[in-house]
């Protein structure tokens, strides 16, 4: 039976292993309906930074804060791996291509938000991602039933947007009420170090 998980967090379980994209992934679900789901992986930083994006798109950035220039891009998923989007808190600014989500979050795929960021006009929280993850109708429901994913509606923006990527999966698990030991018991295997 279909269940809407929009604006919830998916946490890959130890059953997803040896998958370069989804092993120990934390996914924020932007859309979820009877036709399928779309989400962004938020804990897999890439080597590319916002500075690389500004240079590629010829966005002036001489006055951009250094920490912004060094901000990593995140692999949002395997679909459209060259499309950049910004997951961010709403800040009262209207951008050309913004989809408002729940919990005061939005996703923007237009250049105007990148220009704002280059000018140090920043949302409270933001995460630049390239690509996205997608599930067809019933695919995500089936994967959840197969215990590939833990779903949590315990959204914490500080955890969602922090840069402690090596422990973000574990932090979300703990925020959802799980421990590595409870996963070991649940899945009767060693989950390994995060």
From Swiss-Prot:
| InterPro entries tied to this protein | AlgH-like
Q: Which GO terms describe its cellular component?
A: cytosol
Known Pfam families for this protein?
Answer: DUF179
Task: Give the family from UniProt.
Answer: Belongs to the UPF0301 (AlgH) family.
Q: What is this protein called?
A: UPF0301 protein FTL_1216
Whose protein is this, by species?
A: Francisella tularensis subsp. holarctica (strain LVS)
What broad taxonomic lineage does this protein's source fall under? Answer: Bacteria, Pseudomonadati, Pseudomonadota, Gammaproteobacteria, Thiotrichales
């Amino acid at each position: 039976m279909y269940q809407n998980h929009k604006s919830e967090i998916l946490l890959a379980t130890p059953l997803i292993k040896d998958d370069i994209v989804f092993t120990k992934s934390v996914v924020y679900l932007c859309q979820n309906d009877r036709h399928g789901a779309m989400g962004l992986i938020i804990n897999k930083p890439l080597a590319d930074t916002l500075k690389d994006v500004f240079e590629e798109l010829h966005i002036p950035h001489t006055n951009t804060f250094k920490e912004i220039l060094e901000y990593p891009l995140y692999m949002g998923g395997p679909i459209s791996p060259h499309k950049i989007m910004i997951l961010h808190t709403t800040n009262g600014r209207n951008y050309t291509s913004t989809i408002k989500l729940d919990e005061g979050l939005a996703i923007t795929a237009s250049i105007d938000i990148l220009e704002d960021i280059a000018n140090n006009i920043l949302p409270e929280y933001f995460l630049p991602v390239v690509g996205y993850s997608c599930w067809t109708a019933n695919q995500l429901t089936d994967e959840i039933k197969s215990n590939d994913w833990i779903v949590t509606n315990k959204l914490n923006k500080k955890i969602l947007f922090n840069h402690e990527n090596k422990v973000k999966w574990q932090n979300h698990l703990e925020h959802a009420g799980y421990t590595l030991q409870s996963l070991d018991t649940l899945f009767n295997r060693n989950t390994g170090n995060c």
